[in-house]
Structure formats: C-alpha cells, structure tokens
Amino acid sequence: NSFAENTTKPVSTLYVSKIDTSDFVSKINDLKTKIDKSFTISANPYFVIASNLTPQETQEITDNTIAKSIDCFYNDYFEKSPDEITVIFLFKDDETYRYWAKKLYNDDDLSRFGYYKPSQHVMLMNISTGTGTLVHELTHAFARFDFPEIPAWFNEGLGSLYERCSLNNKNIKGYVNWRLPRLQEAISKKEYKSIEKLIALDDDTFYGADSDLNYAHARYLCMFMQEHNVLKTFYKSYRDGYNKNSDAKTYLETIFAKSIGEIDSDFLSWVKTLRYEG
C-alpha cells in the first residue's frame, strides 16, 4: 500500500475554510512521519483524514458522512467555522483502533466506538461499529468554534442526538437509539431527575457518576425539541444570548411558551411512547 493524497472538493457553498493550504501540507507531512503505509491520507476543507479502510470505503464515508454532516450543520445551526485542522483517523477494526490510539496518544481506556481529543485536534474512530459516533464527534468539533461556551448537557445532547441520524437535503435529523432504555429505566424506577435539574448541571457533574443517564436525558430532550421544531431556534437563541449567568430554563420556557414543569410533563409523556428496537 502507498499513501494516497487527494483533496475532496467541498460539496457546499455554505461554508468557506479559513485554513491555509500550506497548513494542510504541513499537517499531512507531519502525519506521514507518525503512521505507516497501511493508511491513505486525504484532505477536506477542515480535516485531514487518515484511514486504513479501503480507498472506496474512505471516500464513501468522506462524501456521505463527513461532507453531508458539514452541509447540514451550516444549513441548520452553525455560523462560525474552524480555524484549525482536525485530524480524523478512520480505523477498519477494533484491533488497529486500539493499537494506534496507544501508539500515538498513549490512550488505552477507550470507548469502543471512538473519541475526540479537542486539545490535540484529533478524532479516532472505530468505523467497524458504524459512523454514528463520527457524526457525534463532528458535532462537537464544529460546536466548539460556533458556541465555545456550550454547556456539557447541550453539547452532549446535540452530539448524541446525531449518533443515529439522516443527512438529507442539508438537513440533519436524529432518531431513537440505544440510549433510550437507560432513560426509560430511570423513569420507571423513579430515578428520573427533572429537566430543570439536568440543565443546571455543571460540566463536571454532568460527566460524573450518572453520566450515562445524563447523556440519555440530554439526548432525548434535544430530540423532543427537534420533534417540536424548536431545536434550531433554541440553539441559535441560546448561543446568541449566552453568558455565564445564562439560564437555559428561560430559553426553553420561551420557545415552548410553557413553564418548565409543563415542558417536563409533556417530555415524560412523550418519552414513554418511544420504542427502541435494538
């Protein structure tokens, strides 16, 4: 195998990369010194993609997942674009995913799906599990530039909403996924915490002992907003008006024209109607 270098043309006129071509060349040359020739390397307006899948598989993911996600994000949500390159590793199997995560970043306590390291501008994706986590992490990669202060509950709610999604006509839509049973279990066992408590969590608490439930709760709150056609409005108004004292509760009550208690009651009734066919 040899390195294949190609530039994927952006399919959208909605976004323009601020990143200089020379930065891509430098990033690719640096990457070549760290990985072997089982990888192909390609460039996208914001990413350098290193993949040990077949060139055809890599191109399909680049076109059908990465490029389409970018189109949807800028049509539906984001205005500001990244000013730095993120490297996306696409791994064909669990073995090579774990090997290179350890070799390159000394990471060994891994999600089986993949993960994003914002501080190092890199994503490592185990594509054998599907592309859902790729879209999740892409959401984070763009949100951190468009809405730098985004709180964890909303950042992870939005990202996890798109773990199972459609990308059609520059619109992204999330569907029921594997996180639903955890939320329904909490409701049935009277362990459910209110939306008001969820949106008041600081980031450390969100990612703490109850993170699996917090992710599920945030995901389905975002899906609930999506189903009521207010998610995009909430994102933009919350982003534009955000400061450290911003109260998501006020924004939710405004877009639903209901009290937070009424929203919670409607949300719980809706969640109970959902089914996950896992």
Predicted feature locations:
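Short, flexible segments with low predicted structural confidence
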Residues: 20, 30, 130-131, 206, ...
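Generic beta-strand hydrophobic packing signal
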Residues: 3, 86-88, 198
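Juxtacatalytic substrate-recognition/specificity segment
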Residues: 36-151, 168, 244-251
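N-terminal low-structure segments adjacent to metalloprotease catalytic domains
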Residues: 1-42, 257-278
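Acidic/His/Gly-enriched intrinsically disordered linker/tail segments
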Residues: 100-125, 148-278
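Charge-dense, low-complexity intrinsically disordered segments
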Residues: 14-18, 52-60, 212, 254-257
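Proteins with a high burden of low-complexity, intrinsically disordered sequence enriched in S/T/G/P/A and R
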Residues: 1-13, 17, 26, 49, ...
